[in-house]
């Protein structure tokens, strides 16, 4: 059975590093425009290329969010954003607006499309409709139960389920509270989270009647995997890198070992909590116990000592990509080093000729030790084959240079996965038909002030 993907949020490049080094299989991130989390740092064109290359080198996928509602006068800007994502060689776009999906397909037909949770897909019929439209993956609404998810798994399309992170009081994509109160629309990436403010119910002041605890169904990853869910998604592009690391580690432990260690559970609760977590939607037992706020004890638990400990856990490269080295050195010939990751093969020949040793000849073990010095890279040499003549001399600097050169070229080869065909000349056109509007109605609309709408 294929392992469920661990999908991590990344609001910054630091979060990308934290996710990858903590064991994520994929990350999702936003461009500067058209992201449903505009408050996150997000990524410009060059940062997106850098992040995607880093992830691909480590065997991690990248999904870019263009999941807001788009206005007609933004379509040229949208076109540039889609082309930028395709040029960066990302693995998929996460979209809400069907117009965005259509334009993306016109510009880069082979670029996979994922249906955002902002589409509010919560039934098998909705999943089926998107599958028939050509979407590769559907991100289900957070509010679904186990039975509802199981029903959706009957459709032959990848499903993505939120397993940890914030819950909205309203279904994603359907909330207009922030837009109505402060003209900051969640469907434009600017939700002010007014549901976290104090609200009274039946004149009982002092409560937070709309604030839900964070969702956490990490403990059910085995069930989700057995159902056929493709991806376990962590919410939190506006959270710190330490949060990303802790959440990813919890998911990886649960998936790979069937439990989460006490240490990781403590980290997960400590980095962010609203008086604990809830699994109420998933198990089908909703109620008042789902509500919670960020208390003083929650804030105190998230101290700098905890964050420092988490940072230290991902400060170094993890060497998660297995490679093999083949080194050959014959007397009177140029040494040759070949590296392979099982898909890509890179060969480098030294500029100097191997000479007969005068004092101490090099041996196979010395060559092996030099080639295994890959600590600052993504690579882990699992097999090092040495084929050298006796009584020869090779400066260690030559071996080091060959190692660096082949790994640099391997980085370049691994960073490009898709190399999409992009239709840059595609022109965006608008229908010329304008629905008839009565003059009296047009006048009324023109004279109405925006403030009167609230």
Region roles according to the model:
Residues 1-22, 26-37, 49-52, 58-86, ...:
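Surface-exposed amphipathic alpha-helical tracts and adjacent flexible/coil segments at the periphery
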Residues 43-48:
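Glycine-rich, highly charged phosphate/nucleotide-binding loops
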Residues 38-42:
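Conserved non-cysteine loop/helix-boundary elements of the Radical SAM core domain that shape
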Residues 122-126:
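Short, glycine/polar-rich helix-capping loops at beta-to-alpha or helix-loop-helix junctions
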Residues 99-100:
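Alpha-helix capping/helix-boundary segments
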Residues 104:
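RNase H-like DDE/DDD metal-dependent nuclease/strand-transfer catalytic core used by mobile genetic elements
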